[in-house]
């Protein structure tokens, strides 16, 4: 798949922008704070409806504006697919082929993206929430049912936490109803994640071995508060853990077990990668990003769009070369950079856009 055209209105520092892309490599060149990353962010939002840089939609609005729109013309093997997102203070409207989508899970997955940004280098050592978000973003694009189950789980989780905070006199029967719903949706979320990580480990290990010259091996472990055993139904096990945690939950007035608390651990040659060297961290994150591309290709039969946000300067020459080797005419790629000196072995066929104070000009 590839994005032919992007139109922005009142997005960040862009009042209006209409830009056509190369189906292969597109480079946004300019100094910092000129608007390079904003364009990449808009592509990400077009794919996933939310930004990777902020949780607040208002941050995406141009100063003193109350609504914004992002439109794109996507090419897939099945044909052209117009995509539209309109954001206001009342919420968001998403359209595919000019038809309004009632559910988020009906929209996400039409345009798949893999983002590699400097903050991704914190994936291994950062907080568990980063690793949960990593799974949610990638898995949500290739499995709409996961988004639906996750949304339902979060809805019941919010209900349960609100109820725990609202009263000191608990209706045990009502709480048991919430627990049953939480266990049903939560067990599905956990199983989706485990299945995804098994595939990611398979693809990721290939990349780790390529980069390390077969000296390193990757294993991935999903760490959950719900004991995973083949002989016990996951829902029943979830309910057991909720029962064990009930006294704690009543005291702290929140839910202490479930996929919202889970984590992922990465191991290189059996050693937790949290304690690996900086070079190993970077190689591992690069391997995971390359694995995401191949995994999405296997599931969707099309390569995703690759977004590289000022990450090349964070990689040494060898890792840059390994990353740029993936950039072919079959993978549309967007790169932001302050200098072409950071880029090695660029393909001959590409577009370079100069960005200055929100103005975009294409190199001749």
From Swiss-Prot:
GO terms for biological process: DNA replication; DNA synthesis involved in DNA repair; double-strand break repair; SOS response. It is found in: Cytoplasm. PROSITE patterns: RECF_1, RECF_2. Its main location: cytoplasm. InterPro entries: DNA-binding_RecF, DNA-binding_RecF_CS, P-loop_NTPase, RecF/RecN/SMC_N, RecF_2. GO terms for molecular function: ATP binding; single-stranded DNA binding. GO terms for cellular component: cytoplasm. ATP binds at residues 30-37. Pfam families: SMC_N. Belongs to the RecF family. The RecF protein is involved in DNA metabolism; it is required for DNA replication and normal SOS inducibility. RecF binds preferentially to single-stranded, linear DNA. It also seems to bind ATP. This is DNA replication and repair protein RecF. It comes from Streptococcus suis (strain 05ZYH33).
């Amino acid at each position: 798949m590839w994005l032919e055209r992007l139109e922005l209105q009142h997005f960040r520092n862009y009042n209006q922008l209409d830009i056509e892309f190369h189906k292969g490599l597109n480079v946004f060149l300019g100094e910092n704070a000129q608007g390079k990353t904003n364009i990449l962010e808009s592509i990400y939002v077009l794919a996933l409806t939310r930004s990777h840089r902020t949780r607040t939609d208002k941050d995406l609005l141009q100063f003193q504006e109350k609504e914004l729109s992002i439109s794109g013309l996507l090419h897939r093997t099945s044909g052209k697919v117009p995509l539209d997102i309109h954001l206001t203070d009342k919420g968001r409207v998403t359209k595919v082929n000019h038809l309004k989508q009632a559910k988020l899970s009906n929209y996400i997955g039409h345009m798949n993206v893999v983002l590699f940004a400097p903050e991704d280098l914190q994936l291994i050592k950062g907080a568990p929430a980063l690793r949960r978000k990593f799974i949610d973003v990638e898995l949500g694009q290739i499995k709409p049912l996961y988004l639906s189950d996750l949304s339902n789980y979060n809805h019941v989780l919010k209900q349960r936490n609100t109820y725990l905070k609202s009263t000191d006199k608990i209706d045990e029967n009502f709480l048991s109803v919430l627990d049953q719903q939480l266990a049903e949706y939560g067990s599905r979320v956990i199983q989706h994640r485990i299945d995804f990580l098994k595939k990611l480990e398979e693809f990721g290990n290939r990349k780790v071995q390529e980069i390390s010259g077969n000296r390193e091996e990757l294993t991935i472990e999903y760490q959950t508060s719900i004991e995973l055993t083949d002989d016990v139904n996951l829902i029943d096990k979830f309910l057991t853990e909720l029962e064990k945690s009930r006294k704690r939950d009543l005291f702290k007035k929140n839910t202490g077990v479930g996929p919202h608390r889970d984590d992922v651990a990465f191991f290189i040659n059996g050693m937790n990668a949290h304690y690996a060297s900086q070079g190993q961290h970077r190689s591992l994150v690069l391997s995971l990003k390359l694995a995401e591309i191949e995994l999405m290709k296997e599931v969707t039969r099309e390569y995703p769009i690759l977004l590289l946000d000022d990450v090349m300067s964070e990689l040494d020459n060898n890792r840059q070369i390994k990353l740029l080797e993936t950039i072919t005419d079959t993978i549309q790629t967007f790169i932001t950079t302050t200098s072409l000196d950071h880029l090695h072995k660029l393909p001959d066929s590409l577009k370079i856009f100069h960005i200055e104070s929100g103005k975009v000009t294409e190199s001749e």
